[in-house]
Amino acid sequence: MSQILVTGANRGLGLEFVRQFLNRGDHVIATCRNPDTADQLHDLQNLGPLEIYRLDVGNQDQVNALQKQLAHLPIDILINNAGIWRGSQLGHISIDEWMESFRINSIAPIHMIQTFLPNLEAGKDKKVISITSKMGSIDDNTSGGSYIYRSSKTALNSAMQSMRHDLTPKGIATCTLHPGWVRTDMGGPGGWIDAQESVSGMIKVIDQVSLKKTGQYIDYAGKIIPW
């Protein structure tokens, strides 16, 4: 049994991560901004050991406070899942929304890793997973647009590469993981796969993450993505 911290766990991919990890016997620490309204998340408590905490990953004080609350708890796997989408085509780019997206999509995952590093060092699996997007690939950008989301994920990818080098000496492996185009609130109804298929694939990838396979930019089916 692994102890796994999942952010953004109240819906979509985060909720499905919690469900599938519990179903296989793991202990899950799930966070979201409003646990009081996360009925679907609370419904999963009958599946196994699940702890639910309030956390806005963009609020540094909340992140620091939660780490102090969980300071005694080894974390085997940290899954930075929380993220936001802000549409942005040329001529309609909001600087405020761009800054917000960088705060949540790019900076918050790195702050989570930095803050919970003592917990990860105490864990047995020692894995850090950041959910990104293929839209963060510079090589794969053949259509333009989506300036805010693309750049926020590209920044995350770059930071995760630095994290790879810094965490390897500590025995912690990293993975920057693309879930596919998923039918969720964020992905919309046109997605190619559902959350169950995406998360099932991602968990298989996560299980293979090791110091020998650290720092990969990879999708839910195990395909390497060009940076």
Regions found by a protein language model. Give the residues of each.
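C-terminal helical subdomain
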Residues: 176-179, 188-227
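The beta1-alpha1 cofactor-binding region of Rossmann-like NAD(H)/NADP(H)-dependent oxidoreductases
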Residues: 53-65, 95
